Amino acid sequence: MTKYSQIAIVDSMTPKSVEYYEKLKKAGVNDVIVTLSRSGYSSYSEIAEIHTDIARRLDMRVHAALSTDLRSPFHDARHFFSVYKYLGYNFGSKTMIMCYPDGNVKNAAKTLHELLGYISYFVNKDDLDVAISKNYLDEGVLNLTDIPDYFNLTVINPNKLNAGVDRAGTWIYTEYFEDEIQLLGYDYYGFYTGQSNQLTLDAEYVAQEGDTWVTIATRHGVWLPKLLDMNDAKYEDKIIPGQRIRLF
């Protein structure tokens, strides 16, 4: 797999130990997204405080996450902000809105927009990320058109070839690390890490180890036959790291 910059989402399932975080750092993770609040939980701040403290002590970049079922956008935003402020997160911190729509929510898109509106009062829209499972998109619980394209999009699609969504800026590729339940992701464009791995504004892409014609076509939204034709290549041709691939 291509060596993109990595992020880790931590929550109540994540081991609360310095040793575990050191293992994450050794694996190449230096950006941690700490779940500060979760719908239906009033005491989540204690867990968030421990994870925030450990990550900061190890000089990891710390970002914030709100896990929501979209049932009560105002309550979710208010509780999130109280923890956000208490733990010293500030304007400019990246914030992930993790959407797990409750089945009783009649209009998930409307409530998501309401929640994003509340959060935008204290988080710049350029620092907001909407995270959602690929399954919810496939089932139509939420559609890509429901998520404004000026927000980063994180797609949770573990154990697959790629994010499965061309627009994805971050892809959660696994749910496990060191035999623990742990969401890890590739940060394609450096939204969290500040390290972009793609020449998105250029007509060419510099191939990295593990790239294939399929992954490049999917990631850049290029029709595979067209990509092959532009590069005078065949589907079975191997890609060499450092090779320059024409995108348009």
Question: How would you label these PLM feature ranges?
Answer:
Residues 1-12, 24-26, 138-201:
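Functionally critical loop-and-helix segments that line ligand-binding/catalytic clefts
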Residues 1-121, 125:
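Substrate-binding cleft of extracellular glycoside hydrolase catalytic domains
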Residues 34, 64, 130-132, 155, ...:
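Structural beta-sheet core signal
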Residues 56, 164, 218:
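Anion (oxyanion) recognition and catalysis
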Residues 65-67, 204-210, 230:
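Solvent-exposed beta-strand motifs enriched in subsets of small alpha/beta binding domains
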Residues 98-102, 127-138:
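Acidic/histidine-rich, metal-coordinating catalytic segments
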Residues 197-221, 243:
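Primarily a LysM-type cell-wall glycan-binding module
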Residues 215-218, 222-248:
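Extracellular LysM carbohydrate-binding repeats and other cell-envelope/extracellular binding modules
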